[in-house]
Swiss-Prot record:
Subunit note: The cyanobacterial PSI reaction center is composed of one copy each of PsaA,B,C,D,E,F,I,J,K,L,M and X, and forms trimeric complexes.
Annotated positions binding [4Fe-4S] cluster 2: 21, 48, 51, 54
UniProt-listed PROSITE patterns: 4FE4S_FER_1 (PS00198), 4FE4S_FER_2 (PS51379)
Gene3D superfamilies for this protein: 3.30.70.20
UniProt key word Iron-sulfur: yes
Predominant cellular place of this UniProt entry's protein: membrane
One GO BP annotation of this record: photosynthetic electron transport in photosystem I
Provenance organism: Trichodesmium erythraeum (strain IMS101)
Residues binding [4Fe-4S] cluster 1: 11, 14, 17, 58
Name of this protein: Photosystem I iron-sulfur center
Lineage: Bacteria, Bacillati, Cyanobacteriota, Cyanophyceae, Oscillatoriophycideae
Cofactor note: Binds 2 [4Fe-4S] clusters. Cluster 2 is most probably the spectroscopically characterized electron acceptor FA and cluster 1 is most probably FB.
Keywords, in A-Z order: 4Fe-4S, Electron transport, Iron, Iron-sulfur, Membrane, Metal-binding, Oxidoreductase, Photosynthesis, Photosystem I, Repeat, Thylakoid, Transport
Gene Ontology MF annotations: 4 iron, 4 sulfur cluster binding; electron transfer activity; metal ion binding; oxidoreductase activity
Length: 81
């Protein structure tokens, strides 16, 4: 099952989520929107197993990285019954 990984602009560029991911789904890319000059990116979402370790590792109060499991994605779009 496919999972969606969303990175929000509240990311502080700390790399905690990248280091927590056991399958290297995430990586850091340059970004001028924060002091660290980088933001998490999710180029390999097809490898995501939905463990949500990246969410747990995120130190921001806003959960800058979110994993939406297949059913959650469907429910959030209003397609689940």
């Amino acid at each position: 099952m496919s999972h969606s990984v969303k990175i929000y602009d509240t990311c502080i560029g700390c790399t905690q989520c990248v280091r927590a991911c056991p399958l290297d789904v995430l990586e850091m890319v340059p970004w001028d929107g924060c002091k660290a000059g980088q933001i998490a990116s999710s180029p390999r979402t097809e490898d995501c197993i939905g463990c949500k370790r990246c969410e747990t590792a995120c130190p921001t109060d806003f959960l800058s990285v979110r994993v939406y499991l297949g059913a959650e994605t469907t429910r959030s779009m209003g397609l689940a019954y």
